[in-house]
Amino acid sequence: MAQDWAGFSEEELRRLKQNKDPFEPQRRIPVKKTRQQLQREKALLEQSQKLGLQDGSASLLPEQLLSAPKQRANSQKPRSPSPVAPSPLTPTSSSGDGKLPGVGSQPQEPGLENSHHGHKSAEVRAPKPDCKVEKKKMELQEKSRWEVLQQEQRLMEEKNKRKKALLAQAIAERSKKTQAETIKLKRIQKELQALDDMVSADIGILRNRIDQASLEYSYARKRFDRAEAEYITAKLDLQRKTETKEQLTEHLCTIIQQNELRKAKKLEELMQQLDVQADEEALQLEVEVEQLLREQEAEAAKQMASVERLCPPDGESVSSELAEENNEPQKQAPSPETDKPGKCCSSSPHRLDCPDPGAKNFSAAVAT
């Protein structure tokens, strides 16, 4: 019979339209889905079953939700309407796509559309009892999560408050310590600056004195070098002069000695010619007497000088007395040659009793 059926007639279609329930929702046209969409829907369904959700939507944290959880729970509704039982008068097509022949081609009336929307709103307003139980479970879960989150938030706030208080206390203590340290550092810096100023002033004074002393030292060194050079030259000159003086005195002594030797030889020759023998002892005594007289004269002169220094007004009388005393022994001392006969002075210029002036000069030179 299915093969002989050719479709609905116009009368049958009219009758179906008249007998159709206005509150019955329009059957959705099935849409072919790809393999990826099917896998995705399957994964979403598994995840919703794990989390206890029926509609397959992933659960979110309360702080991630944009609206209140109750409104979200109330807004959820079953998207797939209950399938309408096919009437015996509406057979399916042989192709299996679910389309009724002739229905898609005919336009739908606006009254039917309004009745369809009213039926949907009635379904939303009157949910099934299973949905209510699930909503209550969701609300309880969300409330428990919300309370846990609130407790955690309170704990975190208390911890943050304590941490802030500790940080403020630590900052205050550190600031006090830093202020005390800065005060100490400033005081130490001032003391060091004062010491540096004192040291710098002392160093400046000492440097000026050192510069002055170095200049004076350089002048003294130059003068010392000049004096040393002059001293060395003077010493060398003195040494040369002393050497020349010694040489000249030696030469003079040798000349005088040679002259005296010649005189002695000459006198011996003359005495031999005159057959006169010289008394050597008398000559020696005469020389000693002359030396004593000279020594007495020198002592008298020294005494006169000392007396003049002590008492200058009476110096003339004392000097006259000393001169008289010195003259008296000269008068009283007789010459040994006058006592002997044949030794008196004669007209002969070469007599032995008359001393030679050259011999006197020689004796004076030897005495000096």
Swiss-Prot record:
One of its GO terms (biological process) is positive regulation of smoothened signaling pathway. GO terms for cellular component: cytoplasm; cytosol; Golgi apparatus; nucleolus; nucleoplasm. Residues 145-310 form a coiled coil. Residues 1-43, 55-133, 302-368 are annotated as: Disordered. Residues 80-89 have a biased composition (Pro residues). This is RAB6-interacting golgin. InterPro entries: GORAB. Interacts with RCHY1. Interacts with SCYL1 and RAB6A/RAB6. The lineage of its organism: Eukaryota, Metazoa, Chordata, Craniata, Vertebrata. Residues 11-27, 114-133 have a biased composition (Basic and acidic residues).
